[in-house]
Amino acid sequence: MILVIGLGNPGKEYQYTRHNIGFIAIEKIANQYNSSFSIKKKFNCEIAETISDGQKIIFIKPTTYMNLSGKSVISVKTYYNIQSAKIFVIHDDIDLETGRIKFKTGGGNGGHNGLKSIDGVIGNNYNRIRVGVGRPQNNQDVADYVLNNFLKSEYETALQAIDRIANNFDLILENKLEEFKNKIV
């Protein structure tokens, strides 16, 4: 069993923001496994479940704001008894140019409030799929930048990155993490 978390903020006003790249990605991946989301209030998230090649996959989108994402993660992790090594968090990263992807296990949160919240409840020994959204320019505030919508060209580049993640997601199910890491670059 694996748990895949897409980070973002709830609400239509955030739907196409840089900070919601995790929601955008997880919707694409869940859709390719013919799985749709439903709200689970007891977990503070939208959840989709499926089985692929005998392995259960649980997808979640926290319904809390980003800085409280850990509430959803700990609820689902505890209920399903999922080990941290089987948790994959998809999130935006301003330290990567738009469309660039990096995969890593463990490490710091890089100032990302969603990761800080998750680290606070389960530690940091889980997998991260970092999707680049670029850095703010001209002294723009980081919070304003990530809470603004993508420019059209940026969004197209971000969607190409999401396609690379989705197209290679079976490698995660096969526990071929190094191969996944190399294919999504």
From Swiss-Prot:
Superkingdom assignment: Bacteria
Reaction(s) this enzyme catalyzes, per UniProt: an N-acyl-L-alpha-aminoacyl-tRNA + H2O = an N-acyl-L-amino acid + a tRNA + H(+)
Molecular function terms from GO: peptidyl-tRNA hydrolase activity; tRNA binding
Active site residues per record: 19 (proton acceptor)
Subcellular location per the Swiss-Prot or TrEMBL entry: Cytoplasm
E.C. number(s) listed in UniProt: 3.1.1.29
Main location: cytoplasm
Transcription regulation listed as a keyword: no
GO biological process terms on file: protein quality control for misfolded or incompletely synthesized proteins; rescue of stalled ribosome
Keywords: Cytoplasm, Hydrolase, RNA-binding, tRNA-binding
Manganese found in the keyword field: no
One Pfam family matching this protein: Pept_tRNA_hydro
EC category name: hydrolase
Residues carrying the site annotation Stabilizes the basic form of H active site to accept a proton: 92
Residues with site note (Discriminates between blocked and unblocked aminoacyl-tRNA): 9
Any one cellular-component term (Gene Ontology): cytoplasm
Cross-referenced SUPFAM superfamilies: Peptidyl-tRNA hydrolase-like
Residues reported in the UniProt entry to bind tRNA: 14, 65, 67, 113
Function as written in the Swiss-Prot or TrEMBL entry: Hydrolyzes ribosome-free peptidyl-tRNAs (with 1 or more amino acids incorporated), which drop off the ribosome during protein synthesis, or as a result of ribosome stalling. Catalyzes the release of premature peptidyl moieties from peptidyl-tRNA molecules trapped in stalled 50S ribosomal subunits, and thus maintains levels of free tRNAs and 50S ribosomes.
Family that this chain belongs to: Belongs to the PTH family.
Assembly mode: Monomer.
Name of protein: Peptidyl-tRNA hydrolase
Organism, as annotated: Rickettsia felis (strain ATCC VR-1525 / URRWXCal2)
